[in-house]
Structures are given as C-alpha cells and as structure tokens.
C-alpha cells in the first residue's frame, strides 16, 4: 500500500485539533485506505485499540447504524473516558440526519472525528452551515503521476509511464490488476456505473438515464473546453435528444457533486473579478474518459491539460481559467495574495505556437510566477521570466 505522504501529513497536522476532518473525493480514490493507514499510525504510536472506533456505512454489517439515534448511542457507549477517542466514519452521508450525530459528538471532550464522503451532499447547504468553522476539508484524488510512478513495479521511462497513466487511469486498484487491459476496462466501467447510478441517478431522482449518459459523454469528450449549458442543450437537441437547459444544469451539478467532474470558473485577470458565464470541466480520472467514450488517440492536448489541473488541485489554492482580453490563460492559481499562472501545450517547438502560448502570459503585468508546461523534453528555458518546463518533470518534481 502506497503511503500518501501529503495527505497523511494533513491528517497529522489536524490530529487532536477541535475540528472535524472531512475527507472527500470520487469513489475508490483511496479515502478508506487513507484513514486505515492513519489508524495504523495511531496504533503504532501507542494509541490503544479501545480508543479507536471505525464504521463503514456501506458495509451491510453496519446497517443498523444508519439510524442516527442508534449510531449515536453506540458511539457514546464505546467512548473511553479520560483519553482521546478517534472516530472514523466512512461514507457517513448514508446515515439520515448524520449531521446531528457529528454535531453532538463534536461537543464532547476527548473526541477526534474523521469522516469520508463520495458526494458533495456531505458538505452542502444546511449541513455546511451547521458545521461552519468546525471542519476542515481534505480533498483526495486518485494517484498523482508521482504516486503512480512510486507504486509501479516496472522500471519504465517517464513518457512510457505517462502513456500508461492516461490509458489505464490512476485509481489505486488499477495497479493491483497489473494493467490487464480487459480487467482495467471492466473495473473502470463498473466504477463509472456505480457513480452514475448510486451518486447521481438515485440521489437526484433522475429518470432519463440514457439522456444523462449522453450528457456525460458530451462532457467527457469536451474536457478543457468552455462549457455553456445552453450549448450542451442545443447540441443534444440537434442530435435528436431534446433536453432543456435547466435539466442539463441539474445533470452537470449532480456530476460535480459526485466528484466525477470538477468545475473551473473563469477569472478576469485585468478586472480582478470572477466571471459568471462559462466554465471548464475536468474529469477526476482520464481512465474514466476512455470507458465513457472509448479510447481515442487524439485530443492529447486536453488530456494533458486535465492532468495538470488535477495536479494543481492536489497542490492547493483556488484554480481559475484566466481571461486576458480576448486571450486565455489555462490556469490561474490564487493562494492568498499570491498568484501562479500556467499555460499547457503539447509542444511549442513551432515558432508560431510558442508565440501564441506565451502572449497571454506576457500580457500579465504583475511579478508572480508564470509557467509554460509542455511535453517537449527540453532543458528548462526562461522567456522574459516565464519558465518553460518539461511537464513530466514538473509532475514528478514540482516547480
């Protein structure tokens, strides 16, 4: 099992602090395994088994605890007085009124709470209001390229590893089935169907599953493109599948809530304001795109852009698409008063491509760092302060 050091460090940072640790992310990205590793770490450091309580609410053995009153009574009964109690709750959003249990336990002394969820419902609306100031969200993703390399048993060069990474995807279990192409496909297809049926269709009570699947295919085929709800609706209608903009908006919202897609808003770099129209959507894992739409040899540029987005999301900060006049910067990352700007391109060895990619970055007048990430395996180059970096090195080594 790969120790996910960055995430383990975050859990350790917040250990014993009076906040609820909420680990969110797409199904099977490793949330349960992360908490299991952290639990083992606690035991190795001398915490008694009696001080640790863990419950997975997808386990049929725990079905009785889906009643929040039964759950609360059970937890209260198992608390050890005078010592810190570590509570690990997997997929707690399955418990009706779970927020009442969490809120009541939070009021107790010597209780450290860790929960996971595969749906944004866990932190939505009234629940988020109830827990405001009481929780910290730790966003978990499938393996980064660096983690993927660490977990590999094969000794392969970066480019070959990257090709496999975008073909098979980055879910931890993929590495256990040793890249068997048919097994990978079956696993990802099963995972995708579970997400769509359990986290989207059931929760949102969607009746036209075929239409939902059509919208998912459209979105997966258009990662990294500006998505306008009306354009999606018009495209579906032109294909003979009439659908309203309101329905499309509901579908997209549900898919984002299930963490299968991530939404990135646009930011006007000159006006310093968030734009209300247009967004880009990125998949939580490129392997899923291959089972949704079939493996395609093209569109490697948007696939690379998707990979870079996920890496930036792992590293933290608010991520936006930058608007500079009529031009666009792929990503603007805001960390407090500090910004980072990123352009992503498969290759800039063509002079015109180089000029086109550099122009939006050169139009930014501040002194914050600017990067041009490409698949060109060349030494790092500076273009008037803009760092051109081989993207696979950046993925492995950071900036």
Spell out what each predicted region is.
Residues 34, 38:
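Hydrophobic positions on the alpha1 helix immediately C-terminal to the Walker A/P-loop
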Residues 23:
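Hydrophobic anchor at the beta1->P-loop junction of P-loop NTPases
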Residues 31:
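Conserved lysine of the Walker
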Residues 2-16:
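Pre-Walker A adenine-sensing motif
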Residues 54-85:
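Short glycine-rich substrate-engagement loop in P-loop NTPases that contacts/grips substrate
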Residues 377-399:
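Domain-level recognition of nuclease-like catalytic cores that cleave nucleotide substrates
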Residues 118-120, 124-226:
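Interdomain motor-coupling "hinge/lid" segment immediately C-terminal to the ATP-binding subdomain
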Residues 181-339:
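Accessory nucleic acid-recognition modules appended to NTPase machines
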């Amino acid at each position: 099992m790969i120790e996910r050091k960055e995430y383990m460090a975050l859990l350790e940072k917040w250990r014993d602090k009076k906040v609820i640790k909420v680990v969110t992310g797409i199904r099977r990205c490793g949330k349960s395994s992360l908490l299991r590793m952290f639990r083992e770490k606690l035991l190795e450091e001398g915490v008694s088994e009696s001080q640790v309580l863990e419950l997975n609410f997808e386990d049929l053995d725990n079905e009785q605890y889906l009643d929040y009153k039964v759950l609360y009574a059970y937890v209260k009964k198992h608390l050890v007085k005078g010592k810190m109690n570590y509570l690990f709750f997997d997929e707690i959003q399955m418990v009706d009124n779970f927020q009442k249990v969490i809120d009541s336990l939070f009021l107790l002394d010597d209780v450290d709470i860790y929960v996971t969820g595969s749906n944004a419902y866990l932190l939505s609306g009234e629940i988020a209001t109830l827990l405001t100031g009481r929780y910290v969200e730790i966003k978990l993703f499938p393996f980064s390229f660096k983690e993927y390399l660490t977990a590999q048993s094969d000794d392969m060069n970066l480019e070959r590893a990257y090709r496999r990474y975008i073909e098979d995807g980055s879910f931890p279990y993929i590495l256990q089935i040793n890249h068997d192409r048919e097994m990978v496909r079956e696993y990802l297809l099963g995972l995708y169907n579970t997400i769509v049926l359990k986290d989207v269709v059931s929760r949102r009570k969607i009746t036209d599953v075929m239409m939902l699947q059509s919208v998912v295919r459209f979105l997966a085929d258009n990662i990294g493109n500006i998505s306008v709800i009306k354009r999606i609706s018009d495209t579906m209608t032109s294909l003979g599948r009439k659908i309203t903009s309101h329905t499309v908006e509901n579908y997209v919202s549900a898919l984002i809530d299930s963490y299968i897609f991530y939404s990135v808003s646009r930011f006007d770099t000159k006006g310093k304001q968030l734009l209300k129209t247009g967004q880009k959507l990125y998949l939580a894992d490129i392997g899923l795109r291959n089972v949704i739409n079939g493996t395609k040899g093209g569109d490697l540029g948007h696939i690379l852009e998707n990979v870079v987005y996920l890496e930036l999301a792992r590293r933290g900060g608010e991520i936006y698409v930058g608007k500079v006049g009529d031009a666009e910067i792929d990503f603007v990352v805001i960390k407090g008063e500090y910004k980072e700007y990123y352009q992503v391109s498969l290759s800039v060895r063509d002079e015109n491509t180089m000029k086109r990619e550099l122009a939006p970055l050169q139009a930014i007048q501040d002194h914050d760092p600017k990067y041009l990430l490409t698949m060109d395996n060349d030494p790092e180059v500076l273009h008037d302060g803009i760092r051109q970096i081989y993207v696979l090195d950046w993925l492995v080594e950071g900036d």
